[in-house]
């Protein structure tokens, strides 16, 4: 999402006010402020109350991937040393859409916060020790024992082993 002039001013003022912060801390804060300024109403998670599922059911181009990348990326940053699962129907879906796509994690999370991207293992490690792991829904047995702190199920309706995938997490 592009910023309007008011949003640009808010970000510039925030950056100026906090320029003494370490780069990673400032980049993370600017990322989160920018997301709050630009997220559309249907892209914001529900307010208030505890919940264990946040479902975004919407059409093509509505920002589902963009929303999920921000949601899981911000949490992985806010909770150091945590483990997060990204799953989609195939390994290629994870790589091409969820990790490397235009709205994928590698284009959403500030580069200064990413320690490593292991393409062959499908893992993004943040500098705070959090791990975002991509495992295809076609291999739900690989979810077991990982004790993830949260998960992003992309294109859940296309999962071959829907129940096994959901139950495994």
Where do the language-model regions lie?
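Phosphate/NTP-binding elements of NTP-utilizing enzymes
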Residues: 2-169
């Amino acid at each position: 999402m592009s910023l309007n002039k008011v949003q640009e001013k808010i970000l510039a003022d925030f950056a100026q006010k906090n320029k003494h912060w370490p780069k990673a801390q400032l980049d993370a804060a600017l990322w989160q402020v920018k997301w709050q300024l630009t997220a559309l109403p249907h892209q914001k998670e529900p307010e208030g109350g505890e919940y264990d599922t946040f479902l975004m059911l919407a059409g093509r181009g509505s920002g589902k991937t963009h929303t999920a990348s921000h949601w899981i990326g911000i949490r992985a940053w806010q909770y150091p040393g945590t483990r997060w699962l990204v799953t989609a129907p195939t390994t290629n879906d994870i790589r091409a859409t969820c990790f490397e796509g235009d709205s994928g994690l590698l284009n959403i999370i500030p580069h200064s916060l990413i320690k490593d991207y292991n393409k062959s293992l499908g893992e993004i490690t943040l500098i705070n020790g959090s791990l975002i792991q991509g495992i295809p829904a076609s291999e739900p047995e690989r979810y077991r024992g990982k004790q993830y702190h949260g998960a992003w199920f992309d294109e859940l309706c296309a999962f071959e082993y829907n129940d096994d995938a959901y139950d495994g997490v």
